[in-house]
Structures are given as C-alpha cells and as structure tokens.
C-alpha cells in the first residue's frame, strides 16, 4: 500500500494527520493524491457545495501595508476609492445574487477595521437585506472586537471572514503594520461573539511548502470550518506585482493536501482561476471577486 493510501485510510477512519505526514504527502504523485483527496471529500462532505459571492463595500485608502493588496494606501495601484456603499446598493446586490442561486453574500470592506459608525451602517444594511431576502450574509470588516462582532450577529450576520494569509513565520515578510496575533485575536473575538469564522490564505506570497502546511494546521487549530484557498493575482503597483503565479497543478496539489488536513471543512475557491476544475472542493466561489483586495 502506498503512503497516500495509508494516510488516506487514517483520515477516513476519523484521524487527523500531523505536519510531518502532510509534508510527506506534498511530494507524492499528483493524480493519486487528488483521487485520494476526492475520496475523503466524498465521505465527509458528499457532493454538496455552496455558492457565495461578495460586494466590495468600501474600497481603497487602507492604512495597512500588505504587499499583495491593491487596497493599500501605501502603493499606487489606481484602484477606485470610495467610502461604504449606501444601504440600498448593498441590498440590491444581495437580492441580485440570491436570484441567481447564490447562498452566501459577503460585505467586504477595506481598512484595518471598521469603526463603530461603519459597523452600524453594515448592521443596517444586513437588517434591510433580511427584510426582503433569505440569503446568508457574511462580513469581512477587518480586526474588529467582540462587541462589534456581537452587533453584527444581532443584525443577522452568520459568518465573518478574516484570512491569516500565510504562515506565522512568513507573515512579517507580507505585512508589518499589524501582526499574526492581531488576526488570531480578532478570530477568537468572533468565536466568543458566537459567529462562524471563515479564514484561510493566499498562495503565491513567497511562501515555502512548509509555510503552506503551517497555515493549514494553524487554521485547523483555530477551529475554522471554512477555509478560502486563494491564488495570488499580482497587482501592478504592489511589491508583489512580479511574483510568479502558481500553476493549476501546484494549486491542485495544495488543495489535495489541505483536504487531508481538513476532512470535514469547506474550501472556498476562486472560479475565475480555473479552480472549478479541481474536484477536491465542496465549495466554489462564483460571481464578483476582488483582486485580492482583502481586508486584514
């Protein structure tokens, strides 16, 4: 029995794999690895997947210096800049997406964190959406505190998004205006407020294979149930504009190994980059996508 099959059987029996096993899997034959990951996906997730999309609710002028990000005020990316969209605009887009079969709709905003006034604006938008729609609403509002998360939950937000982006070791190479611990603190605050958390990372930030595995295991340790696996789209004007884009084969390998690490988790994958061809995922992102203009 091959190494892939041995570890697959352990996972199918409900066991978690360790870092050493994940690193071993990364170097195994791709097609066998993907087929084994698909067996794990089918046993624990079936053929169910969710459709989700986003609205760029607030754009540009971010104080943070994340090297991949078009939203940062530190770089000249010619991105459109605007404050929080009107409640009616946010509601209209929610209804538009629900009519097209989307189950989750996320209000994504630029900046380190929404202030209290902005949080209330988002809450009002969510309440208005739920007057006319049953779509589930998520929010990506940065490094919020527990009180702010509780307000979002009371308004009807079911999930918040906060990517770790990369491993703890690699993070200082990506951003220096906030820390890994800042992100983890926000994720834990969301949990305390009783909101589900979506957290993952971007592949192609100069990370090593070990960094990718460390990210996956950090997310698993935090108890996150939905993990975005994003591919860097190098934005002109950012420090990472010349970073090489990972191949589809490399992304397949990453998602397959992550499936071994997360047997029951959902993966959120970008439809535009051909991830719909990766059959290990139970969740695909359709519709409007940002060019990694993510908040903290």
Annotate each language-model stretch with its function.
Residues 119-127, 155-161, 208-225, 252, ...:
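Short, electropositive alpha-helical surface patch
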Residues 18-20, 25, 29, 48, ...:
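C-terminal accessory regions of radical SAM enzymes
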Residues 14, 37, 66, 162, ...:
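Conserved, mostly hydrophobic/aromatic
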Residues 149, 172-174, 203-210, 225-246, ...:
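Flexible glycine/acidic-rich beta-alpha junction loops that bind and position SAM and/or redox cofactors
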